[in-house]
UniProtKB/Swiss-Prot annotation:
Homodimer. Interacts with rbcL, atpB and THI1. One of its GO terms (cellular component) is chloroplast thylakoid. Induction: Up-regulated by salt and desiccation. Chaperone involved in RuBisCO assembly process. It comes from the Eukaryota. The lineage of its organism: Eukaryota, Viridiplantae, Streptophyta, Embryophyta, Tracheophyta. Residues 1-45 form a transit peptide. The gene is RBCX1. It comes from Arabidopsis thaliana. GO terms for molecular function: protein folding chaperone. One of its GO terms (biological process) is ribulose bisphosphate carboxylase complex assembly. This is Chaperonin-like RBCX protein 1, chloroplastic. Belongs to the RbcX family. The keyword Plastid applies.
Length: 174
């Protein structure tokens, strides 16, 4: 049968027995490791996501958003150039024909190294990307839309499955 002292934390035992507090904590490795484990489970109310290795899902989403902000910045700069600097607009269009924006940093680094004119375009894209991310992107709206899209998609898929498997007549079948 377990003694009551193994069920109590060492700080409580040192209050009850002054000699107990002088013992090294190393003599209770099982109690310490199980306590840490329980704390982790109790404190975390989020889902465990296995298999992402190098990055969390949030980090991967942030990377995709980062690349998307580059794409948006290129669109904004392109639209601005089209109206007031057609020559620079054509240079950017030609560069876009041969270089993908799927990796935003690689795109900007390549653009910077092309020529001094391209360097100015790249700096403008970096400036617009930062300003759009910090000032104009509607983060709350994105969160709301993401929740709505997931809920709507789940509902639609479940409805389709139920209709396929239940052989229920719908109004269109009559």
């Amino acid at each position: 049968m377990e003694s009551s002292s193994s069920l109590l934390h060492h700080s409580y035992l040192s209050y009850l027995n002054p000699k107990f507090g002088k013992r090294p904590l190393v003599s209770y490795p099982l109690m310490q490791s199980s306590r840490k484990c329980k704390q982790t489970r109790i404190c975390s109310n989020k889902m465990y996501v296995p298999g992402f290795g190098e990055a969390s899902p949030e980090a991967k989403a942030a990377k995709h958003l980062h690349d998307f902000f580059t794409y948006v910045a290129v669109r904004i700069v392109s639209a601005q150039l089209e109206s007031y600097n057609p020559e620079a607009y054509m240079e950017l269009r030609e560069f876009l024909d041969t270089n993908s924006v799927s990796d935003g940093d690689k795109f900007c680094a390549t653009l910077m190294r092309r020529s001094s004119r391209h360097m100015n375009l790249a700096l403008r894209i970096l400036e617009v990307r930062s300003a759009y991310c910090k000032n104009d992107f509607e983060w709350d709206n994105m969160k709301r839309l993401a929740f709505k899209n997931v809920d709507d998609s789940n509902t639609r898929l479940m409805r389709e499955y139920v209709l396929e498997t239940s052989h229920v007549e719908t109004d269109s079948d009559k």
